Amino acid sequence: PLWSRGLGDVYKRQTENTARDFDMARQYLGQHTINFYGASYGTWLGAVYATLFPEHIDRLVLDSAVDPTGIWMDNFGSQGDMQRRRMYEMFDFFAARDNLYHLGDTPLKVYTKWYRIIGREMQGPTTPRIGAPPAQIGDVPPQFKRNIQLYLTGYNLARPLVDRIERALHAWEAPNEKNEHNLWEITGLAFTSRTYWSQVAAYMQNPQPKPLTKEEKEEKSVSDNVFRAVTCNENATVPKPLNLPATGIAYFMGADIFTLKNLIASSGIMCLGTRPNTKPINVTGAFLKNRPVVLQSIYDTQTPYAGGQKMAHAMNAYFVKADGGDHGVYVYDNPEAWELVNNYYLRKPIVTRTKLPYARVDEH
């Protein structure tokens, strides 16, 4: 059981308490001020800490920031659209490098291979089904070569409806044996960074699904419970319970995984049976010695761009946008981001740059 792992009452966990624990660590280290770097949830922790203890923050970088006005369900309920976009970007990426990955020379061919593997591995209600990308010239069968445009127009008009019908039919399938180490697990990582795309390609070339080990299941259980505890204890978003039956209707009518994800997250079902026991801190950077920095990818799949802008406004921060959709800017292969952040920490805490390029990616 969870409590035997020494976590105590996990449902009392919240970011404000963690921030106060963090300050105890600062005191123990004998540091009057600290520099703080936080990514993803760490941006919320950093903003809360800086609000509670502004006199102890020197320089603060928030990378891929959460929306401080949408804690927490509004943040989760706006991820699906960017994740759908990211999927198609990945299919485009593989197709443009077919000589390297051998997954198909059009996004549709790559998608078809991906979708077949997903179907074999996961079959049933939890299968993450998505629509096909548009067909291109390379997808036209030989017998239609004289009427390429007519074929593409007809195909691309009909395919979304066909996909929706197929998803509705598959909704009634019995699930396969569950192997949590699968293509969808790796694809989930690939949402966050192109760094993982080569792993997706390698898996697609040689699929080997595996179940979680006993130790992995225990670790996942602890992680999930802590995540749920912090989220539900602090949630200030009004749940939309009508989205729950809407999810069921959408599911059996063939909605894709990203539409369903947004509906489920915003419904509040994750926190069913629990009530918030605190209110999120109204974060502010008004009392900080130096202005913080917020880094945000335009198409971030986990913490959408607009939320980062709101965090920058609340914290009176320098706002620097990065091309692409990586969740985390400084943490990947982006020398210009490294230079900006390192100069901010080690030299003058002033940032004049407002834009960064997409991180580089090792295609192998």
How would you name each of these model-derived features?
Residues 326-335:
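Catalytic histidine-centered segment of alpha/beta-hydrolase-like enzymes
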Residues 1-11:
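Single conserved hydrophobic/aromatic residue that forms the stacking wall/gate
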Residues 301-306:
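Conserved alpha/beta-hydrolase "acid-adjacent" motif
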Residues 53-109:
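A catalytic-pocket lid/entrance helix-loop region that shapes and gates access to the active site
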Residues 19-33:
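Conserved acidic catalytic loop of the alpha/beta-hydrolase fold
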Residues 294-296:
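Short beta-strand/loop motif that positions the catalytic acidic residue
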Residues 119-286:
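Alpha/beta-hydrolase fold active-site neighborhood
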Residues 32-68:
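Conserved hydrolase catalytic core segment
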